[in-house]
């Protein structure tokens, strides 16, 4: 029961012990028979101290900026976390706390390696990076990445002046000539002239119809003399044809029913006009 009480008291003290007392008092007991100096003489309940503990505020370990990030991480984790049962540790000096001795408090190197960038280029802080950045354009095609920009949550980008300087620097010695594009109006005229010269001699070609602006009206097909004679005979007997008779006449004269119908309509209009004007007078 005493061993369990000792371990429980150690866990509680490691959480609530202030820094000044924690630095001057050893963490582990000298032996299994001795008790901790802060442990009361009589222990009734191992968990009795949990109800009255208070957690004092400590300054934050991580600063506002990332200026203490080293270039290489430690090989093992034993320097950050210490096992409770492995060995006994003496009092720690007043400069640093033993629980927070880690690579975070080591001085940083001169450059910050970028994991996503190729290894051939080195993006680091240059000695004259600040002066060149405030004065004018940065030399070269790459911009130095400053840690202050990463601390503020932004990434340094070259201003428009720097971009113009970089483009002018890369364009030295190379003559850039702008090729004039084709004028749409000239292109249309050229195509029209080419088509006109190609199809102007062939009027039967359907491609050249739009060039010659030929009429879309169907060519007139006059009736033959035999057809007109037979139609005139039929008109003398009947000025109006029935559907059956119109079909027979069209079949005999090798015409369509629509052609026969139109001819009879025109013939009736001509007769009507002739009757209206009267017969011509003989001198």
From Swiss-Prot:
SUPFAM superfamilies: Homeodomain-like (SSF46689)
Record bears the keyword DNA-binding: yes
InterPro entries cross-referenced by the UniProt entry: Abd-B_homeobox_TF (IPR050803), HD (IPR001356), HD_metazoa (IPR020479), Homeobox_CS (IPR017970), Homeodomain-like_sf (IPR009057), Hox9_activation_N (IPR006711), HXA9/HXB9/HXC9 (IPR017112)
GO molecular function: DNA-binding transcription factor activity, RNA polymerase II-specific; RNA polymerase II cis-regulatory region sequence-specific DNA binding
Role played: Sequence-specific transcription factor which is part of a developmental regulatory system that provides cells with specific positional identities on the anterior-posterior axis.
Similarity comment: Belongs to the Abd-B homeobox family.
Name this polypeptide is given: Homeobox protein Hox-A9a
Origin species: Takifugu rubripes
């Amino acid at each position: 029961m005493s061993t369990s009480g000792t371990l429980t008291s150690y866990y509680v003290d490691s959480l609530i012990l202030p820094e000044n007392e924690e630095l001057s008092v050893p963490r582990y007991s000298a032996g299994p028979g001795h008790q901790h100096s802060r442990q009361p003489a009589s222990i009734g309940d191992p968990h009795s101290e949990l109800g009255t503990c208070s957690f004092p505020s400590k300054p934050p370990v991580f600063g506002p900026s990332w200026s203490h990030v080293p270039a290489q991480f430690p090989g093992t984790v034993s320097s950050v976390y210490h096992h409770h049962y492995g060995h006994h540790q003496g009092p720690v000096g007043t400069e640093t706390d033993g629980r927070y001795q880690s690579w975070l408090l080591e001085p940083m190197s001169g450059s910050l390696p970028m994991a996503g960038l190729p290894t051939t280029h080195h993006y680091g802080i240059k000695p004259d990076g600040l002066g060149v950045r405030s004065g004018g354009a940065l030399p070269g095609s790459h911009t130095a990445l400053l840690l202050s920009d990463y601390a503020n949550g932004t990434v340094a980008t070259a201003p428009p002046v720097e971009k113009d300087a970089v483009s002018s620097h890369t364009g030295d010695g190379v003559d850039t000539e702008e090729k004039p594009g084709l004028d749409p109006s000239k292109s249309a005229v050229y195509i029209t002239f080419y088509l006109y010269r190609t199809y102007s001699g062939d009027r039967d070609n359907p491609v050249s119809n739009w060039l010659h602006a030929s009429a879309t009206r169907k060519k007139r097909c006059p009736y033959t003399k035999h057809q007109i004679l037979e139609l005139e005979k039929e008109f003398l007997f009947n000025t109006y044809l029935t559907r059956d008779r119109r079909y027979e006449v069209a079949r005999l004269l090798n015409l369509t029913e629509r052609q026969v119908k139109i001819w009879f309509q025109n013939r009736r209009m001509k007769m009507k006009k002739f009757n209206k004007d009267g017969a011509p007078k003989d001198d």
